[in-house]
């Protein structure tokens, strides 16, 4: 599937509150606390101590999405020139370190597309399609979760007070960006 990496990304509205993020390395890890400890040492990022939280170190992050599910993101600085090679090397290093420990490790780098929604109305715009309470007190900086945006599954991560990282399946990217554009119409120019 090398051609997937060279496909053009879905059109993203040219508004300052939304932007397409560069391709990144994405690996899903399912494993218990022992696997998490080994993976953290290899990945170079400590895993969060609390569920639905993310940790970031340099250009890598870990998002705790479920009881034994973690999304590992790499190349968040946009410096993933050879995405496939880096993802394969990272997955190989993790697989080798985890050895015979019960775990599942899957490279999903090409499956997803990432958006950044930012600005003073970011939470309100996302609330137009997301059922979660995105008030800063309820969904603080560093929180992440699987949820939906209208009919699309997404991973939502609040990276700063008014900045959200949204992971969506590539096949739903046009749908999600279109809905974001419609919802944001009332905020144009503000």
Over which residues does each language-model region extend?
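Basic, glycine/lysine-rich polyanion-binding surfaces/domains
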Residues: 1-190
């Amino acid at each position: 599937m090398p051609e997937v990496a060279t496909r053009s990304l879905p059109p993203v509205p040219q508004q300052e509150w939304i932007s397409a993020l560069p391709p990144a390395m994405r690996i899903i890890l399912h494993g218990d606390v022992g696997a998490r400890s080994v993976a953290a040492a290899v990945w170079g990022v400590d895993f969060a101590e609390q569920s639905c939280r993310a940790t970031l170190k340099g250009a890598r992050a870990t998002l705790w999405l479920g009881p034994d599910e973690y999304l590992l993101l790499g190349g968040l600085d946009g410096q993933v020139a050879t995405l496939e090679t880096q993802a394969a090397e990272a997955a190989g290093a993790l697989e080798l370190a985890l050895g015979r420990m019960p775990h599942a490790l899957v490279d999903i780098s090409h499956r997803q597309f990432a958006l950044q929604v930012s600005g003073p109305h970011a939470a309100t715009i996302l609330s137009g399609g997301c059922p979660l309470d995105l008030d800063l007190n309820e969904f603080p900086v560093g929180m992440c979760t699987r949820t939906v945006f209208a009919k699309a599954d997404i991973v939502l991560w609040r990276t700063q007070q008014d900045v959200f990282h949204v992971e969506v399946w590539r096949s739903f990217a046009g749908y999600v960006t279109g809905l974001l554009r419609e919802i944001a119409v009332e905020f144009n120019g503000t």
